[in-house]
A protein has these predicted regions:
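Single conserved hydrophobic/aromatic residue that forms the stacking wall/gate
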Residues: 2-12
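Glycine-rich phosphate/pyrophosphate-binding loops
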Residues: 37-38, 44-56, 140-161
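Short, polar loop motifs at secondary-structure junctions
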Residues: 35-39, 80-86, 226-230
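Long, compositionally biased charged/polar accessory segments in the mid-to-C-terminal portions
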Residues: 214-393
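Polyanion-binding loop/helix "lid" in catalytic or ligand-binding cores
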Residues: 127-130, 176-229
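Acidic/Gly/His-enriched mid-domain segments of enzyme catalytic cores or analogous surface patches
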Residues: 42-140, 291, 295-298, 302-308, ...
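Histidine-anchored nucleotide/phosphate-binding helix
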Residues: 22, 29-43
Length: 393
């Protein structure tokens, strides 16, 4: 697998000339579709060899079902991480999951079951599906990647994904989806083939993460055929210049990937006692008690946030580090908002009054977290996201 070429269609500006190149070389490379790119490939009758996803929400499953072609998906290899919506794998005959680095599942497995087979924990798979599209094949040993549609931005606001993808099932929906994704994005970045690309924080972070993955894997040759943002360590490469000549034995190669995989001989019962609900509640109760005070200065609030982060650092050094990983995202998010409010006005006394309802929401969240944590192993998103209606023709 180390010498195989990988054609990697992503979700954004997936042009018709790219489709022609992929069609021409589909027997000479492994095609990996990322997220909504599969809808563009489906529309022109090209089947990827591997499909990757990264989000844990039900809309990922609903999007795949919306292709309305179950047989198309059956013999595609599905690759993702342990946080993916569990229904996704039911659409494919073959699926393989790796742990997502820095998520609780990886910590629990590695801390409590070191006697079992070592399992991969993938980093660099966030924030967007294109990130796992780069990280996963590199981890599997692929050395030559060709990126299509990995734009991480756009030249023209009305054109943000392939015209063949489900984003453009109707014009009104395409506009609404574009507004959701980009809004008032004003970041300007250097383009892969020149010009300027408009990006935003999420897409720019995705670009940066890809650059870090490529920097850590200098033996990988990455060719960026996308008419989007420049990616360091990915050579700008017009798709028309791709000249692959050696056919790939896809069955053998995908079979080889299968040899890297094995079921984990554990069930929910093995993990339930490891959650340590008692310790989680002690941790939450301690923070609740500390936040239920009358603050007299900005500094008191700042110091309390730092102290709470200190608790996470201490927990991270123990076998309960999964608890720190459960809470770190929410604490980062809420404390960022609290810090922003804390310095919104010059008058300290008035600011502290404004902080009270914000702190109240934080306390509400902590109480809700205590309710939710015991059900962590059964918590699966079953919400029908109304955004799905925009993808339907």
């Amino acid at each position: 697998s180390t010498q195989a070429k990988t054609l990697f269609p992503y979700t954004t500006l997936f042009r018709s000339d790219s489709i022609t190149v992929i069609e021409k070389n589909k027997d000479k490379a492994i095609i990996i579709s990322c997220g909504s790119a599969i809808s563009a490939l489906h529309k022109v009758g090209i089947k990827p060899d591997i499909h990757v996803e990264t989000e844990r929400t039900k809309i990922v499953y609903d999007f795949l079902v919306n292709l309305n072609d179950p047989e198309y998906l059956r013999d595609v290899l599905f690759l993702s991480t342990d946080v993916i919506h569990p229904d996704c794998a039911s659409l494919f005959n073959r699926s393989a999951l790796a742990f997502k680095l820095s998520e609780p599942g990886a910590a629990l497995y590695h801390n409590y079951f070191p006697h079992l087979n070592a399992c991969a924990a993938l980093g660099g798979v966030n924030p967007l599906v294109g990130n796992i599209g780069v990280s996963a094949p590199i981890h599997l040993g692929f050395k030559n990647l060709y990126l299509f549609g990995l734009d991480n931005g756009y030249k023209h606001k009305g054109h943000h994904h392939s015209k063949l993808s489900s984003y453009y099932n109707n014009e009104e929906s395409a506009g609404a989806l574009g507004e959701m994704m980009y809004g008032d994005s004003l970041w300007q970045r250097e383009g892969n083939f020149g010009e300027t690309i408009i990006s935003n924080a999420m897409f720019d972070t995705s670009r940066w993460v890809i650059e870090q993955v490529l920097a850590a894997n200098e033996d990988v040759s990455c060719f960026n055929c996308s008419d989007g943002v420049k990616i360091e360590r990915a050579k700008a490469f017009p798709s028309a210049d791709i000249t692959l000549s050696i056919p790939v034995d896809k069955s053998a190669l995908l079979g080889e990937i299968g040899t890297f995989c094995a079921p984990i001989p554990l069930s929910k019962k093995n993990f339930e006692p490891l959650l340590d609900i008692e310790f989680f509640n002690i941790f939450i109760d301690k923070m609740v008690a500390e936040w239920q005070q009358d603050f007299t200065s900005r500094n008191e609030i700042n110091q309390l946030m730092l102290r709470n982060f200190g608790y996470l650092a201490q927990i991270s050094a123990t076998r309960q580090q999964h608890i720190a990983q459960v809470m770190i995202g929410s604490m980062n998010y809420v404390f960022t908002l609290l810090s922003s409010i804390l310095y919104s006005f010059e008058d300290e006394e008035k600011t502290l009054v404004l902080m009270q309802p914000a702190i109240g929401l934080w306390l509400e969240f902590l109480e809700k977290a205590k309710e939710m944590y015991p059900q962590a192993l059964d918590s699966v998103d079953m919400i029908d996201n109304e955004v799905m209606n925009l993808f339907r023709a």
